[in-house]
Amino acid sequence: KNSGHYGLSGYYAEQAVKKNLITMIFTNAPPAVAPHGALKSLFGTNPICFGTPTNSKIPFILDTSISMINRGKIRVAAREGTKIPEGVALDKYGKPTTDPKKALEGVQLPIAGFRGSGLAWMVDILSGVFTGGNHAGRVKDPFENFTGPQNIGHLFITMKANLFSSDYNRRIKDNIKTVKKLPKIKGIKEIHYPGQNKFYRFKKNENKEIHISKKVEEDLENLKWVYQ
């Protein structure tokens, strides 16, 4: 509790996996997602992360949120004047919108309807109610409210991978191999497990330049003069 935005959940999962630990991570966030059936946002995008060793150099890291789209992507779209995908947000009147500015004024939609709403609620309980942090819409938005700390709650659960089975490494390897051997739909060369694509992208791009849009470049240039 008494925390703020802690960055990427997957980073912490990677540290646990390096020590041969299975990990589950939950954190709540400022209001962005409306509970199923509500017109007002209350839950955050509330990331959920799971990590496990795989007996290979590529760990299994599932790092996702319960919303249809990351809130940061909506902010980027609003700043750059682009649209967001259909079916991810409602405006303040409860109507579907692809306008990022209207989406920020309205609500984001959870994944899988009422199921995603239930997951968001679960994360709010685990990381907010259980830890003693803010919950039920009380987490402050750092972009809009500077009156005090966010008091976000995080919950980290770690377990030894071989806690119940001494041959976990063999079993997880067999599990992944079984999934990867399934018949594939047309155009799919390999079935990837969570974290695999990220690993490949990182290796491909780790020595390349980072390209940013002209608008972001201008914003950074303006900040330089503000804080120098």
What are these regions (language model features)?
Residues 66-69, 115, 161-163:
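Glycine-rich beta-alpha junction loops
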Residues 18-22, 44-47, 55-59, 83-86, ...:
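Short coil/turn connectors at secondary-structure junctions
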Residues 14-17, 51, 87, 119-127, ...:
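Predominant activation on well-ordered alpha-helical scaffold segments within soluble catalytic domains
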Residues 33-101:
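Phosphate/diphosphate-binding glycine-rich loops and adjacent basic-rich segments that engage nucleotide
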Residues 130, 135-228:
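Catalytic-core signal marking the mid-to-C-terminal active-site face
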Residues 20-35, 126-142:
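Glycine-rich phosphate/pyrophosphate-binding loops
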Residues 71-132, 149:
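Small-residue-enriched flexible segments
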